[in-house]
């Protein structure tokens, strides 16, 4: 939800920053299927009944290399290295914690979420988390819409996606060098 809110905000601010929203439909994204497969793996890991925790954890970790296929194929777009860094930090935190993103109990409480919800969770308070600072340590307060927890990796992914949207649209918020680099490779 955090990423969706950032994408909506980025799109809404493009015209305010002198960009053209029409440019979004002109960009040719490659390997879009990887987004659907990667996110599908994550959703299936959380929602499919009858899977062992080990299989669920493996599916969560496996989603990241699949999503990386999209990132590598679209590396020329502004912001993709930032998205990749955020994804790598999330993958690291998840991989060293058995397929679960560690969540700060304080962040979960602040977002109004259960620290120990039943069943497999993609983000949960763990007894002895590794690299806890890379986990979901930030929160949107429970009193706000879309309250949830998120990580520094999520922040970097959101910033990278916003940078990509503004860069593709020619916004003044993205340095002209990044825009001209994208424009020098039309149809790529």
Question: Could you say what each language-model-derived stretch is?
Answer:
Residues 39, 57, 87, 133, ...:
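Hydrophobic transmembrane-helix microenvironments that flank and shape a buried ionizable site
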Residues 181-188:
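Long, low-complexity, intrinsically disordered cytosolic termini of multi-pass membrane proteins
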């Amino acid at each position: 939800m955090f990423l969706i809110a950032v994408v909506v905000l980025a799109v809404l601010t493009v015209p305010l920053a002198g960009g053209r929203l029409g440019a979004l439909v002109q960009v040719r994204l490659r390997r879009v299927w990887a987004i659907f497969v990667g996110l599908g793996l994550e959703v299936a890991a959380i929602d499919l009944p009858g899977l062992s925790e080990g299989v669920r954890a493996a599916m969560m970790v496996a989603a990241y290399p699949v999503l990386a296929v999209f990132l590598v194929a679209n590396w020329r777009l502004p912001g993709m290295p930032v998205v990749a860094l955020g994804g790598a930090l999330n993958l690291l935190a998840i991989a060293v914690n058995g397929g679960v993103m560690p969540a700060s109990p304080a962040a979960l409480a602040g977002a109004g979420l259960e620290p120990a919800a039943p069943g497999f969770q993609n983000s949960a308070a763990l007894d002895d988390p590794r690299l806890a600072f890379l986990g979901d340590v930030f929160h949107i307060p429970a009193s706000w819409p879309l309250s949830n927890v998120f990580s520094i990796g999520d922040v970097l992914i959101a910033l990278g996606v916003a940078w990509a949207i503004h860069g593709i649209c020619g916004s003044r918020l993205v340095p002209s060098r990044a825009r001209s680099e994208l424009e020098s490779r039309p149809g790529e």
